[in-house]
């Protein structure tokens, strides 16, 4: 007597369980990791999504919760495991795991705690997905992207930090609020360190190609009567404010990471301000990672756009570089 499945379905081709072609792994199922996972699922970017964490109950619960929504998604396979074998053959590995930033704590204070976590994560990622692109989200992201690059042995174009993609998004949102224009039509770049010492490039701020600095030569300076400098100040303070109000940030960074994942997985060659090794650029002489406009595709970072920065902007970038290098050279890994 055949079973019901055999009565219902006639098998034509034996399923050989071919490996996923567009697999994405998210390491860490905290608030940020799950916001990344959900945003990626809503964009239909992967044919397999793998979740990894050290807390097995939460990990299984998050996986099951997503699986139960499969009817509403277009990602056929969602898996999880504490063992990194579940991540095998990933095209993109997104690292969100790490100690959470506390209220009032600077991103740089998190460093050594998260370095120790990376010493376990990165070798396991490399073991099972030696050809993957690494996208680091954990804070302080610029230092930890450097750490991931050093530990992984990957070429620099395949180790990317989410960097100022979110800072620039916040900047464009706040700019739009001030002008009454949607953020997508407001153009401006925040570069350098993700966070406290990020650098707004005021000369590039425009709407429909109209430079705001042409209309207001004092834009972003202390002499600016419209106080546009406050917009960047809000960008810097916004994460701290959200953490104070709800305990952590999640949705905006999740959407930002999915935006980067889309460009990489679809080989779109869009330009994003992401953290990459900037040695040799803008007078930087050390192995530091900072955000500059990068062309992204399925090989990672293929090109860097050479921005025309003012002397004071370059000086701020170099100061960020010096600060980060001062921290990096003291790290133990």
From Swiss-Prot:
Catalytic activity line of the entry: (S)-lactate + NAD(+) = pyruvate + NADH + H(+)
Top-level enzyme category: oxidoreductase
Pathway: Fermentation; pyruvate fermentation to lactate; (S)-lactate from pyruvate: step 1/1
Gene Ontology terms: biological process: lactate metabolic process
Record-listed substrate binding positions: 107, 139, 170, 249
Catalytic residue positions: 194 (proton acceptor)
Cross-referenced Pfam families: Ldh_1_C (PF02866), Ldh_1_N (PF00056)
Recorded GO CC terms: cytoplasm
Keywords for the protein's UniProt record, in alphabetical order: Cytoplasm, NAD, Oxidoreductase
Superkingdom per UniProt: Eukaryota
Residues that bind NAD(+): 30-58, 100, 139
Record EC number: 1.1.1.27
Annotated CDD domains: LDH_1 (cd05293)
Family matches, as PROSITE patterns: L_LDH
Function of the protein: Interconverts simultaneously and stereospecifically pyruvate and lactate with concomitant interconversion of NADH and NAD(+).
Family named by the database record: Belongs to the LDH/MDH superfamily. LDH family.
Subunit-structure text: Homotetramer.
NCBIfam families: L-LDH-NAD, PRK00066.1, PRK06223.1
Protein name as annotated: L-lactate dehydrogenase A chain
Encoding gene per record: LDHA
């Amino acid at each position: 007597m055949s079973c019901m499945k055999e009565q219902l379905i006639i098998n034509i081709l034996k399923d050989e369980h071919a490996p996923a072609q567009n697999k994405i792994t998210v390491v860490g199922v905290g608030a940020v990791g799950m916001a990344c996972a959900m945003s990626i699922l809503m964009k239909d970017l992967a044919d397999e999504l793998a979740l990894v964490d050290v807390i097995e109950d939460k990990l299984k619960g998050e996986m099951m919760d997503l699986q139960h929504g499969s009817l509403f998604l277009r990602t056929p396979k969602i898996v999880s495991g504490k063992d990194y074998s579940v991540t095998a053959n990933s095209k993109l590995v997104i690292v969100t795991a790490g100690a959470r930033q506390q209220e009032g704590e600077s991103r740089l204070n998190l460093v050594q705690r998260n370095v120790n976590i990376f010493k376990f994560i990165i070798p396991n990622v490399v073991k099972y997905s030696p050809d993957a692109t690494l996208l680091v989200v954990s804070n302080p992201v610029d230092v930890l992207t450097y750490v991931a690059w050093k530990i992984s042995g990957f070429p620099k174009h395949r180790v990317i930090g989410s960097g100022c993609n979110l800072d620039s998004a916040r900047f464009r949102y706040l700019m739009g609020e001030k002008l009454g224009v949607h953020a997508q039509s407001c153009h401006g770049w925040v570069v350098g360190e993700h966070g406290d010492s990020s650098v707004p490039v005021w000369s590039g701020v425009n709407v429909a190609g109209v430079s705001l600095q042409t209309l207001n030569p004092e834009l972003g300076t202390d002499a600016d009567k419209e106080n546009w400098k406050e917009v960047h100040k809000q960008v810097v303070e916004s994460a701290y404010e959200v953490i104070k109000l709800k305990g952590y940030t999640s949705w905006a960074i999740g959407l930002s990471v999915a935006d980067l994942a889309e460009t990489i997985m679809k080989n779109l060659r869009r330009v994003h301000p992401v953290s990459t090794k900037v040695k040799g650029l803008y007078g930087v002489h050390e192995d530091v990672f900072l955000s500059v406009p990068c062309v992204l595709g399925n090989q990672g970072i293929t090109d860097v756009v050479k921005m025309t920065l003012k002397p004071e902007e370059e000086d701020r970038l170099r100061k960020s570089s010096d600060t980060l290098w001062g921290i990096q050279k003291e790290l133990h890994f």
